[in-house]
């Protein structure tokens, strides 16, 4: 089954489209994504289901890229089983309400790495990268002000290695990539407009 992230334009409701690859990718249904603005979906290992990053931001074609609900937005990460039933929904702390969860990656053991994009005052320095372990505990990676500010409030992509110990996050706005070993920043490098990142040879 191919799963696509979609939006119901008039209501703002997030949707997941379901398409059967054995039927020439015919659409066979849709389900609620668990939030507003689903941005990325990944399969969980061992046929455990799927995980979705709901960014929380409502838009409408009539208004272009204008963000319509920042005063009440709340992003989340939603977990679904193989029957596409919602099993769990995790949110960032209340003070992180304006942090839009956009990108995901999943390790071979089911640890979920995620990256966010800060929608609040850009002078505020907030965590932008985190992970959810196999017990479904959410952790934000805390950095010092210098390292955090390099990311310019914007994560463009994340990747996690097979073992789940290493997470890479990129910021095209900052032109920088960070690599974390669990909660510790261990490496960084700079490249203009750096963005897409993937794990290779897990």
Say what each PLM segment does.
Residues 13-23, 67-84, 126-136:
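Beta-propeller blade signature
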Residues 2, 50-51, 113, 166-168, ...:
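Conserved beta-propeller blade signature
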Residues 147-182, 188-198:
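Loop/turn-rich, solvent-exposed surfaces of beta-rich toroidal or solenoidal domains
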Residues 30-34, 91-97, 142-152, 187-192:
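Surface loop/turn motifs at the tips and blade-to-blade linkers of beta-strand repeat domains
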Residues 3-13, 52-73, 115-126:
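Short, conserved, GDST-rich strand-edge loop motifs in beta-rich repeat architectures
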Residues 1, 35-43, 97-104, 150-159, ...:
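Repeated scaffold domains used in trafficking and secretory/extracellular systems
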Residues 46-48, 109-111, 163-165:
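Short coil/turn segments that connect the beta-strands within blades of beta-propeller domains
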Residues 1-45, 53, 58-60:
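Asp-box/WD-like beta-propeller blade repeats and closely related beta-sheet repeat scaffolds
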